[in-house]
């Protein structure tokens, strides 16, 4: 069993937000100026079947969990690797289940299928499908942040951007393309993986404390997004045409 102690903590109870004050977007340059944060709780790597029961017993105590997965990156078209890691986090502790070592344990599949426990992820359908290839189960009460953030005025869909919009802090994505099938996870990989699962949980908890926009407000925001996207496309076409004219003149 492998423990990692992190150095920062972001407590939902310490955050006071006014409802409907989130900006719809944040650009990459603005994110780079934000202070870096990461999960500072206990990280436990599960790489032997004997560790699973205790982890499942702990996780079953909670009604909301943050979930994320990782797979070995592929740099060839059409080549995909199976899910290598599933991270399940509370605010204080994150378990990293190494599926290359323990498969998808039945106890964890039962948590994912338990309607009494809310599981929160991002692009969650892809994660769930990957996990079901390890062991089939019927997912229940799984919430995808991408399907709900627009109700709070947030149009960006990436985890780093959503987190930055809500908390004004940056989470690192530097370990995303590392090899998750290595014999041992590095401390940097463990920190990255736990931070992603924890971040989804924290985002959900804050949104649950925030009054959503009305349906009319959401539709108006979506329409504004479509118009802005169309304007950007027209500007890009105009620049391309201008460049072609300059080349031909």
Where on the chain are the PLM-derived regions?
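N-terminal accessory regions of nucleic-acid-interacting proteins
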Residues: 10-65, 134, 145, 198, ...
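Conserved DEDDh/DEDDy metal-dependent 3′-5′ exonuclease domain
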Residues: 44-47, 60-64, 73-173, 177-192, ...
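Short conserved active-site loop signatures built around small residues
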Residues: 68
């Amino acid at each position: 069993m492998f423990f990692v102690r992190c150095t920062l903590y972001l407590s939902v109870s310490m955050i006071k937000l006014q409802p409907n004050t989130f900006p719809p977007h944040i650009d990459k340059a603005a994110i780079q100026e934000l202070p870096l944060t990461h999960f500072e709780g206990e990280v436990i790597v599960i790489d032997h079947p004997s560790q699973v029961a205790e982890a499942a017993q702990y996780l079953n105590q909670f009604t909301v969990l943050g979930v994320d997965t990782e797979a070995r990156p592929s740099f060839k078209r059409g080549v995909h690797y199976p899910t290598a890691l599933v991270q399940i986090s509370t605010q204080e502790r994150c378990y990293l289940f190494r599926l290359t070592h323990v498969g998808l344990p039945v106890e964890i599949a039962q948590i994912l299928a338990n309607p009494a426990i809310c599981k929160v992820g991002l692009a969650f359908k892809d994660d769930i499908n990957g996990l079901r290839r390890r062991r089939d189960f019927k997912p229940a009460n799984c919430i995808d942040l991408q399907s709900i953030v627009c109700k709070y005025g947030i149009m960006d869909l990436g985890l780093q951007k959503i987190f930055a919009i809500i908390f004004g802090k940056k989470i690192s994505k530097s370990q995303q393309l590392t090899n998750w099938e290595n014999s041992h996870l590095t401390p940097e990989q463990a920190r990255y993986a736990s931070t992603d699962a924890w971040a989804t949980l924290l985002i959900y908890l804050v949104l649950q404390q925030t009054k959503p926009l009305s349906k009319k407000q959401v539709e108006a925001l979506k329409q504004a997004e479509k118009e802005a996207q169309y304007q950007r496309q027209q500007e890009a076409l105009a620049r391309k045409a201008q460049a072609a004219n300059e080349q031909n003149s």
